[in-house]
Amino acid sequence: MVHFTAEEKAIITSLWAKVNVEETGGEALGRLLVVYPWTQRFFDNFGNLSSASAIMGNPKVKAHGKKVLSSLGEAVTHMDDLKDAFAHLSRLHCDELHVDPENFRVTPGKRAVIVLAHHFGREFTPQVQAAWKKLMSAVAIAMGHKYH
């Protein structure tokens, strides 16, 4: 279990309160699909994913990105119990979607941190980045929990 300090929790919740989930979620998932094209196989029902511009403009990518980033809101509100907060999603990705748990560590969290940094600019200080990277790592661990 990952422990968050009061300062880290404050940093994370303060920034999260300013996040435009719809815009940021779509951008983060779009970047994931562009940078890691093998992940597109999990989204074969999304239609045209043939180019970066097609992906970034795809309404299904945007909608699912919003859904994914909304689940990150669960992480923000349940930092002290991520394993239980993500138990259902972990089971879904393990038992039904068969997503390799390595994908949780390598891909989505990094894209989200990059997109947050892009959107918040100077406000995304090294301390903010460190807190968010810690949260993303903890979410990856929670998402991979049912695989063990």
Swiss-Prot record:
Q: Could you tell me one molecular function GO term of this UniProt entry?
A: heme binding
The entry's note on the tissues where this protein occurs is: Red blood cells.
Binding site residues for heme b: H64, H93
Q: Which InterPro entries match?
A: Globin, Globin-like_sf, Globin/Proto, Hemoglobin_b, Hemoglobin_oxygen_transport
A single GO CC term for this protein reads:
blood microparticle
- Record carries keyword Repressor: no
Would the keyword Metal-binding turn up in this protein's UniProt record?
Answer: yes
What the entry lists under Pfam families is as follows: Globin (PF00042)
Keywords recorded for this protein, A-Z: Heme, Iron, Metal-binding, Oxygen transport, Transport
Q: Which residue ranges does the record assign to the Globin domain?
A: 3-148
The UniProt entry's GO biological process terms, in alphabetical order, are: hydrogen peroxide catabolic process
UniProt record similarity statement: Belongs to the globin family.
Explain the purpose of this protein: Gamma chains make up the fetal hemoglobin F, in combination with alpha chains.
Fill in the subunit field for this protein. Heterotetramer of two alpha chains and two gamma chains in fetal hemoglobin (Hb F).
Supply the name of the protein.
Answer: Hemoglobin subunit gamma
Which species is listed as the source? Carlito syrichta
The protein's gene is named: HBG
